[in-house]
């Protein structure tokens, strides 16, 4: 098991070094309260150039309000990271958003994602939150990962997050 590191603000740019490449061939669509898989194809070869421009200020704002950015390194290479925001989310404002969550392509399937997810869940509980709010890309394998961690569809999505990412699958994972 790789020991997690808490990133400092000046290290947030390292998040973009994670190899997010993957082939996506099935997506989920939420209809009538149920997930419906459908075929679609994306060959993701890394970060879209607009991602850094769009999300870096969001990451920095999260950090500045006390958010935690956990990272796993193999030597000098960042191989996985997760960010837990402190801003209240959800219908009762008692959830904390899993703001960023990626495992490098060559490290998937080794338990690193599960390790980081559990770390964020424990951190949310320590901060007094009822659980995690996850706004997931609709990629079937990603959503299935979250479901396997104990997430479930949230009945009432966070208004701001749903407006920002209406195609995402909005989930909640309660602290145990």
Per-region residue spans from a language model:
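Short glycine/proline-centered loop/turn elements that form peptide/ligand docking sites
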Residues: 113, 117, 139-142, 159-165
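Short polar/acidic secondary-structure junctions
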Residues: 88-90, 137, 159
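Acetyl-CoA-dependent GNAT
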Residues: 9-10, 17-94, 99, 104, ...
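Conserved catalytic-core motifs of GNAT/GCN5-like acyltransferases
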Residues: 133, 147, 152-169
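Conserved GNAT acetyl-CoA-binding A-motif
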Residues: 124-137
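Conserved acetyl-CoA-binding loop-helix of GNAT-fold acetyltransferases
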Residues: 100-103, 109-122, 147-148
């Amino acid at each position: 098991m790789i020991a997690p590191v808490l990133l400092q603000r000046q290290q947030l740019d390292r998040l973009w070094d994670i190899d997010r490449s993957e082939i996506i061939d099935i997506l989920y669509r939420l209809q009538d309260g149920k997930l419906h898989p459908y075929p679609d194809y994306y060959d993701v070869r890394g970060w879209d150039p607009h991602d850094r421009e769009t999300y870096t200020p969001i990451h920095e704002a999260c950090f500045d309000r006390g958010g935690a950015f956990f990272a796993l390194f193999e030597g000098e290479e960042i191989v996985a990271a997760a960010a837990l925001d402190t801003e209240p989310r959800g219908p009762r404002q008692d959830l904390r958003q899993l703001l960023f969550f990626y495992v490098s392509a060559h490290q998937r399937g080794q338990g690193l994602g599960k390790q980081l997810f559990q770390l964020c869940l424990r951190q949310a509980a320590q901060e007094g939150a009822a659980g995690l709010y996850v706004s997931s890309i609709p990629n079937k394998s990603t959503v299935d990962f979250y479901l396997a961690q104990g997430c479930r569809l949230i009945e009432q999505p966070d208004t701001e997050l749903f407006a920002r990412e209406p195609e995402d699958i909005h989930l909640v994972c309660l602290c145990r």
